[in-house]
């Protein structure tokens, strides 16, 4: 672009596309994208459950620690995105306070859910209950991922949206494995339970693509991400408590520490595909 004084300015502009209206075709299209990004990878991750159930108790603890590492990375990644998004909000909304409030509310909500599940299954959180909490935390994060994908397509960032789809699909396979890890302790897991966990963790990505595609609004991003932060951190606390009671040798063993670091490394590596 050249100004009237002859000064040239270079700026990349996203491809011009019509913002999609709410039609049956667009709803189906965004829904398919959300399914591919959220539900399908979670199912593929859960497919590792038979192998995990045959593993030694130390390796089961390692995979639980890996789940904690996955969610720790998810929490800090989402927190960074939440603060980045709140920086662009009007000052009247008090973006920083909004983010911290979202973290606190979601953390307290998951604490309540944990107490209810523990009361239903016994004094301590069972593997099934822990898997449910992990699925909830991942589902809230996938809501934010779907929002990012839907928004990128709605504003014309077609290449970015495509890269996000591929990256998040790979990313979420690891998260499906994280849900499967607590279930390895269960003597029997029924198919409806696995289907329910896959929907809890993956279906929010579908809702996120719809919201991002049809309601292009930066104000929604910060609270969604902050809610994911609080949920993920609360689930990590639950996993650590579970490992402290059940892991052979406690939290300081090489299997537990190595599993945690491996979880962080996996999420960082797959996250490069969406960066």
Explain the meaning of each model-derived region.
Residues 6-275:
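Intrinsically disordered, metal-sensing/regulatory segments
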Residues 1-3:
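Short, aromatic- and glycine-rich surface loops/edge beta-strands on solvent-exposed regions
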């Amino acid at each position: 672009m050249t100004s009237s004084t002859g000064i040239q300015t270079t700026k990349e502009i996203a491809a011009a596309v019509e913002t999609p209206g709410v039609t049956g075709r667009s709803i189906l299209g965004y829904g398919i994208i959300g399914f591919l990004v959220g539900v399908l990878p979670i199912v593929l991750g859960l497919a590792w459950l038979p192998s995990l159930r045959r593993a030694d108790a130390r390796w089961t603890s390692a995979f639980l620690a890996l789940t904690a590492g996955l969610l720790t990375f998810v929490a800090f990644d989402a927190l960074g995105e939440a603060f980045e998004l709140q920086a662009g909000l009007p000052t009247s909304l008090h973006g920083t306070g909004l983010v911290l409030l979202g973290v606190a509310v979601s953390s307290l909500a998951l604490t309540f859910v944990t107490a209810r599940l523990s009361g239903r299954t016994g004094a301590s959180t069972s593997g099934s209950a822990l898997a449910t909490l992990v699925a909830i935390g991942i589902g809230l994060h996938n809501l934010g991922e779907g929002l990012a994908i839907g928004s990128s397509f709605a504003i014309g960032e077609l290449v970015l949206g495509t890269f996000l789809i591929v990256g998040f699909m790979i990313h979420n396979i690891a998260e499906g494995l994280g849900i499967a890890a607590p279930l390895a302790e269960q003597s029997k897991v029924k198919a409806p339970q696995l289907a329910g966990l896959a929907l809890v963790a993956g279906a929010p990505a579908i809702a996120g693509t719809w919201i991002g595609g049809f309601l292009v609004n930066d104000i929604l991003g910060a609270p969604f991400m902050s809610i994911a932060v609080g949920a993920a951190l609360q689930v990590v606390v639950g996993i650590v408590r579970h490992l402290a009671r059940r892991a052979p040798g406690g939290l300081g063993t090489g299997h537990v520490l190595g599993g945690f670091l491996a979880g962080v490394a996996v999420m960082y590596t797959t996250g490069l595909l969406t960066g």
